[in-house]
Swiss-Prot record:
<dbReference type="GO" id="GO:0005737">
    <property type="term" value="C:cytoplasm"/>
</dbReference>
<dbReference type="GO" id="GO:0051083">
    <property type="term" value="P:'de novo' cotranslational protein folding"/>
</dbReference>
<keyword id="KW-0143">Chaperone</keyword>
<dbReference type="InterPro" id="IPR046357">
    <property type="entry name" value="PPIase_dom_sf"/>
</dbReference>
<protein>
    <recommendedName>
        <fullName>Trigger factor</fullName>
        <ecNumber>5.2.1.8</ecNumber>
    </recommendedName>
</protein>
<feature type="domain" description="PPIase FKBP-type">
    <location>
        <begin position="161"/>
        <end position="246"/>
    </location>
</feature>
<comment type="function">
    <text>Involved in protein export. Acts as a chaperone by maintaining the newly synthesized protein in an open conformation. Functions as a peptidyl-prolyl cis-trans isomerase.</text>
</comment>
<dbReference type="GO" id="GO:0043022">
    <property type="term" value="F:ribosome binding"/>
</dbReference>
<dbReference type="GO" id="GO:0044183">
    <property type="term" value="F:protein folding chaperone"/>
</dbReference>
<keyword id="KW-0697">Rotamase</keyword>
<dbReference type="InterPro" id="IPR036611">
    <property type="entry name" value="Trigger_fac_ribosome-bd_sf"/>
</dbReference>
<dbReference type="Pfam" id="PF00254">
    <property type="entry name" value="FKBP_C"/>
</dbReference>
<dbReference type="InterPro" id="IPR037041">
    <property type="entry name" value="Trigger_fac_C_sf"/>
</dbReference>
<dbReference type="GO" id="GO:0061077">
    <property type="term" value="P:chaperone-mediated protein folding"/>
</dbReference>
<dbReference type="InterPro" id="IPR008881">
    <property type="entry name" value="Trigger_fac_ribosome-bd_bac"/>
</dbReference>
<dbReference type="GO" id="GO:0003755">
    <property type="term" value="F:peptidyl-prolyl cis-trans isomerase activity"/>
</dbReference>
<keyword id="KW-0131">Cell cycle</keyword>
Length: 432
């Protein structure tokens, strides 16, 4: 076998291989012997068919199969010998084949980039230092009460957190526009559902009032014909309701799994959940900064085959989220996912090099801790832990999470890490 390797462009490679004619003939004869042992031909017992008849009937197809097998096996041998690491599926380009002559073919593919990590010492990471305070717990309790609130009609003017029912008609330059008209529209104020200025224009008005408000659509508004346009909305306010928050009764508290129904028990449970969320948020904030610094410090080429593969993964995930099927997933424009796919491939290659150079392996103690932490959010943590322990795929996924954490820690060990006092609310809003 003769082998030559050339660089086509960037990460592209072409391996040209020549297989000696005698190697091909030896393999063909060997395979014909195997075929002769199995075939049945009228007039001959199984395994007793003369080789010339076997060759006459099956020679062409056997030769084709043998060539395909030799091409594949010789390519694998060649890349092992040349220490080449292909990325993605190779493209075989067969040359002209004549019986009794050497056979030359080429294989085109991309290789993984040679990554040499640099600039780790210049990465800057700001670690949030956060404590869950009693005031934070109070805010969360109010949020829980608001989620369980009922609505009661009121006579006064609409306030920032009221719920209103209204009719409205929007116009731009005196003309109505699509989506700008509604009847008996229910709007919970203070959630930012409407364009800026709309809710402010409703506040202070009472039931039965008809009025007009002036607003301007944001420049980044989704409808092209409305971006940055001034608009008027004629409004008829038909109902104003205010929240009635439930009291922290024993019955209310037990809804959240606090068996003794006490306020102290609820506060303790809420604090525990907040601290678990906080731990994850701090971890994610530090991780995102470390990865961003790693990517900026290391500009690497990326095999297009890996990007294509990642795009397919993202397409399928998007289709699943919206109830689509495989066919619909593949029809989604690749442009929607290309940037994210490339980013994920780059991050994967860089973290892979961190893992390789630091000879990291998943710490089973960490894996166990991650599973226990995740399971603590469920009603029966022991059941969740047992379910994970019996599922190889889930365990492998968690080992990958642990290994990624260890890689991030290896980056942080060389990076410039500082601390910054932050409130719980500020950090969680950054995560949103």
């Amino acid at each position: 076998m003769q082998v030559s390797v050339e660089t086509t462009q960037g990460l592209g490679r072409r391996v040209t291989i020549t297989i000696a004619a005698d190697s091909i003939e030896t393999a063909v004869k060997s395979e014909l012997v195997n075929v002769a042992k199995k075939v049945r031909i009228d007039g001959f017992r199984k395994g007793k068919v003369p080789m010339n008849i076997v060759a006459q009937r099956y020679g062409a197809s056997v030769r084709q199969d043998v060539l395909g097998d030799l091409m594949s096996r010789n390519f694998v041998d060649a890349i092992i010998k040349e220490k080449i690491n292909p990325a993605g599926a190779p493209n075989y380009v067969p040359g002209e084949y004549k019986v009794g002559e050497d056979f030359t073919y080429s294989v085109e593919f991309e290789v993984y980039p040679e990554v040499e990590l640099t600039g780790l010492e210049s990465i800057e990471v700001e670690k949030p230092v956060v404590e869950v305070t009693d005031a934070d717990v109070d805010v969360m309790l109010d949020t829980l009460r608001k989620q369980q609130a009922t609505w009661k009609e009121k006579d006064g003017a609409a306030d920032a957190e009221d719920r209103v029912t209204l009719d409205f008609t929007g116009t731009v330059d005196g003309e109505e526009f699509e989506g700008g008209k509604a009847t008996d529209f229910v709007l919970a104020m203070g959630q930012g559902r409407m364009i800026p200025g709309f809710e402010d224009g409703v506040k202070g008005h009472k039931v039965g009032e008809e009025f007009t408000i002036d607003v301007t659509f944001p420049e980044e508004y989704h409808a092209e014909n409305l971006k940055g346009k001034a608009a008027k909305f004629a409004i008829n306010l038909k109902k104003v309701e205010e929240r009635e928050l439930p009291e922290l009764t024993e019955e209310f508290i037990k809804r959240f799994g606090v068996e003794d129904g006490s306020v102290a028990g609820l506060r303790a449970e809420v604090r525990k959940n907040m601290e678990r969320e906080l731990k994850g948020a701090v971890r994610n904030r530090v991780k995102s900064q470390a990865i961003e610094g790693l990517v900026k410090a290391n500009d690497i080429d990326v095999p297009s085959a890996l990007i294509d593969s990642e795009i397919d993964v993202l397409r399928r995930q998007a289709a699943q989220r919206f109830g689509g099927n495989e066919k619909q997933a593949l029809e989604l424009p690749r442009e929607l996912f290309e940037e994210q796919a490339k980013r994920r491939v780059v991050v994967g290659l860089l973290l892979g090099e961190v893992i390789r150079t630091n000879e990291l392996k998943a710490d089973e103690v960490r894996v166990k801790g991650l599973i226990e932490e995740m399971a603590s959010a469920y009603e029966d943590p022991k059941e969740v832990i047992e379910f994970y322990s019996k599922n190889k795929e889930l365990m492998d996924n968690m080992r990958n999470v642990a290994l990624e954490e260890q890689a991030i820690e290896a980056v942080l060990a060389k990076a410039k890490v500082s601390e910054k006092a932050t409130s719980f609310n500020e950090l969680m809003n950054q995560q949103a």
